[in-house]
């Protein structure tokens, strides 16, 4: 009987798991059907046709590549999506990584072309998809929304199980330094909508990395970079952690990030002084100038990844600084205005702190994600089924033990009544 009960429990668990898988598959198909319905209404749109052809060409290139030696070419490497408004410097940052790509010209002197819809970057350890800034712009129109949804449909078709391994959210330092709360929150809200779409589409909360571009506009950044070696300039500059969930979690994460970053900058500054490196006034003030970005970044993060009872809370993983092109000027701060500026050594189109971010940080984080938190109907049903099953099993086991005890006691009583002489003989 015990074996039978165990078999029933195992069978029930397998049925629940199978039912959940069927439900997930049907829901994914339903989402695809919705996207396809929208696409059919715009099937004659040449922009969408170009988008589909471009995607298929890149996927075919992947399928025919040597990655098939290691398994499904679409699943061998992690995939990352890069989003940010037009002019934020995301395409420049990817171009200046100094990483090899099989289909893109990534020379340091290569001209930066605006992203039409999306561009693929096939790096050796990761696949990066750079998306058009208009997809996440507060001024986006209906056609931009249709293109974005088509892109999600294609992404779902290509990687139905794996989805995205991470999302890089790009915002430039100039916007953060200006600290226009209304604009930053508006930008963050639009990005939050796109992030929530992706989370619901793939049923997981993937890591999100905030990349602050155009960091050369921070007073002292370029002068400080000029004191570092080539190897140091390839390293990532930022903070990696896991934000807690709940109200104010993004603020706590931001506080830890800026404390960690500025402390390391101060230690490096001290180390430079000990080694006899000439420290200009901008280099001395650089850690303090970095702190000027914090208020604006707080406004942006609260709208982009802050807790919201109606939305899934994104998994904030890291904050990083980078520069793909040094303009030779910076946004003056309060402290820098009282000092005489030092001449800037021009470093034309040099990628700073980008190589390891795209080449090591992102690929190393593959497989890091959290399940969604909002309870949907299926989770409620499966949880209730689990409780009912657990109670049923406990009732069955208890009933079995009670019945066994009663049957054994009855049998012993019958034996004692049938052979009373044996008991008497034993006593003599």
Task: Pin down the residues of each PLM region.
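Basic, amphipathic N-terminal segments
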Residues: 1-428
């Amino acid at each position: 009987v015990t074996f039978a009960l165990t078999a029933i429990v195992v069978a029930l668990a397998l049925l629940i798991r199978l039912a959940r898988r069927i439900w997930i598959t049907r829901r994914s198909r339903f989402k695809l059907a919705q996207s396809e319905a929208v696409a059919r209404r715009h099937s004659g749109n040449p922009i969408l046709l170009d988008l589909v052809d471009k995607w298929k060409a890149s996927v075919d290139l992947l399928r025919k590549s040597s990655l098939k030696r290691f398994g499904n070419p679409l699943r061998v490497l992690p995939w990352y999506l890069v989003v940010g408004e037009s002019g934020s410097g995301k395409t420049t940052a990817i171009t200046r990584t100094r990483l090899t790509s099989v289909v893109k010209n990534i020379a340091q002197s290569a001209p930066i072309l605006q992203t039409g819809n999306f561009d693929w970057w096939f790096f050796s350890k990761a696949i990066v998809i750079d998306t058009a800034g208009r997809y996440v712009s507060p001024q986006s129109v209906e056609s931009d929304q249709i293109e974005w949804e088509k892109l999600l449909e294609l992404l779902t078709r290509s990687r139905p199980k794996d989805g995205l391994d991470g999302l890089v959210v790009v915002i430039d330092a100039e916007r953060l330094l200006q600290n226009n709360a209304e604009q930053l929150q508006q930008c963050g809200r639009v990005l939050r909508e796109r992030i929530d779409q992706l989370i619901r589409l793939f049923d997981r909360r993937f890591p999100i990395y905030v990349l602050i571009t155009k960091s050369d506009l921070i007073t002292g950044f370029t002068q400080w970079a000029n004191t570092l070696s080539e190897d140091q300039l390839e390293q990532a500059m930022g903070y990696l952690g896991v934000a807690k969930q709940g109200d104010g979690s993004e603020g706590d994460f931001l506080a830890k990030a800026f404390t960690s970053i500025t402390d390391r900058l101060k230690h490096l500054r001290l180390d430079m002084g000990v080694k006899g490196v000439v420290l200009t006034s901008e280099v001395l003030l650089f850690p303090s100038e970095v702190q000027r970005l914090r208020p604006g970044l707080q406004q942006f993060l609260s709208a982009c990844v802050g807790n919201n009872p109606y939305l899934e809370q994104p998994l904030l993983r890291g904050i990083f600084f980078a520069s793909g092109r040094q303009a030779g000027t910076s946004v003056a701060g309060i402290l820098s205005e009282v000092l005489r500026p030092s001449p800037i050594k021009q470093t034309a189109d040099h990628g700073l702190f980008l190589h390891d971010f795209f080449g090591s940080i992102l690929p190393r984080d593959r497989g890091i994600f959290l399940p969604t938190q909002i309870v949907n109907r299926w989770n409620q049903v499966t949880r209730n089924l689990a409780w009912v099953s657990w109670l049923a099993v406990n009732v069955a086991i208890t009933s079995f033990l009670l019945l066994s005890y009663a049957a054994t006691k009855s049998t012993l009583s019958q034996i004692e009544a049938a052979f009373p002489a044996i008991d008497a003989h034993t006593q003599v």
